Amino acid sequence: AVGYRSCYDEGKRCAETLFMDYHRQNNVRVKIIRIFNTYGPRMLPNDGRVVSNFILQALNNEDITIYGDGKQTRSFQYIDDLIEGMIRMMNTEDEFTGPINLGNPNEFPVLELAERIISMTGSSSKIVFKSLPDDDPKQRQPDITLAKEKLGWQPTVELEEGLKRMIEYFKNCLLYTSDAA
């Protein structure tokens, strides 16, 4: 079925096809990695992703918006884990092109993520629920079996530790922004 997200999904599929065609025609070394929900320092505070949105809202004691009931799950991968996986993928034999999934298979309900961030920031934010868009997936969890087999890779940074680092980074961003004003 063609839904609101179809262009996003098809764009990624099309890009993989173009890379493989270019690889076959020009004998160029290609590696295809499918990246799942990555977060970490140096993210733009206003990039619109759930982790950065929740942290900024919590640090500013603003309401945290959850679409749906918050039971939908997401898997969050810390940037250091992604980089390690990418380096390992680049170092595989030329014949192995992928695709390979790099992500954290541990799922967290969106509501639990919001509650955890509020707790970790000491925020007075309240959680506000809004209607869930029709195209929003109820679950996103990567299968990293191939990454484990081919790369000897799996994520090592736990969500709690990654959030701690992100919160500290965003606190510094907010301090810098308010000092510059």
Which role fits each region the language model picked out?
Residues D69-K71, T97-I100, F108-E115, G122-Q139, ...:
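C-terminal "lid/loop" region of Rossmann-like NAD(P)-dependent oxidoreductases
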Residues A1-I32, M43-D47:
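Catalytic helix-loop patch of NAD(P)-dependent Rossmann-fold dehydrogenases
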Residues Q77-D81, E158:
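A conserved structural motif in NAD(P)-dependent oxidoreductases
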Residues L82, L102, L113, A147, ...:
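Non-catalytic, hydrophobic alpha-helical segments
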Residues Y176-A181:
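Conserved small/polar residues in nucleotide/adenosyl-binding loops
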Residues R13, T38-N53, E62, Y67, ...:
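Glycine/proline-rich active-site loop of Rossmann-fold NAD(P)-dependent oxidoreductases
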